[in-house]
Regions:
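Nucleotidyltransferase catalytic core that binds NTPs
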Residues: 1-190
């Protein structure tokens, strides 16, 4: 069975930080591939300042640079889903012989409680959280940790995640890449 890591986002714009966490996820989790799911419109982000889906897809393709195991897709547009909690079940139906692992940065973990039916994500597929700036004591307290603490795998057992039944998750402490889409849009460099 193929195991795919799903990295969803606006990718406005895509950057080396996205590639960085994808490469670590491939290696540490033993994934067959990572799909960058470029969201038509993140419900938690304003439309003002958002590049078109076509522009964001092209930018993501440029960063991926034909990596054989990282694929850029606008599958949410084709599925007609708006929320991750709806996208994952639709993907599982469409690809019944594929195991999915949801990938996210610690920056998103800290605010996942704002996502539509966020607990459904953890109950649907294993989740891997990868370090993103800023790092500190923040991951010691968040709603996902409070709710699913007993299902948290230690990093040295992260490779088991692809065989685990949800809810199961891990936090991968990887070297940090400070790039962020917000900083790039604001003209900052890192």
């Amino acid at each position: 069975m193929t195991t795919i890591g799903l990295l969803g986002g606006s990718f406005n714009p895509a950057h080396e930080g996205h590639l960085h966490i994808s490469l670590y996820a491939l290696k540490m989790l033993g994934l067959d591939a990572v799909w960058w799911m470029v969201s038509p419109q993140n419900p938690l982000k304003p439309t003002r300042g958002m590049a078109t889906l076509t522009e964001r897809m092209a930018g993501a393709e440029k960063i991926v640079n034909r990596h054989p195991r990282i694929h850029v897709t606008d599958i949410e547009k084709h599925l007609g889903t708006r929320y991750t909690a709806d996208t994952i079940p639709a993907l599982k139906i469409r690809f019944p012989r594929t195991r999915f692992i949801w990938l996210m940065g610690t920056d998103n973990l800290l605010q996942i409680h704002r996502w539509q039916e966020w607990e459904k994500i953890f109950l649907s597929v294993p989740v891997a959280v990868l370090d993103r700036p800023p790092r500190g004591n923040t991951v010691k307290s968040c709603r996902a940790l409070e709710r699913f603490r007993s299902r948290l795998l230690p990093q040295d057992e992260a490779a088991r995640l692809k065989h685990a039944h949800a809810p199961a998750w891990t936090i991968l402490h990887i070297p940090l890449n400070g790039q962020s889409s917000t900083a790039i849009r604001n003209g900052a460099t890192s």
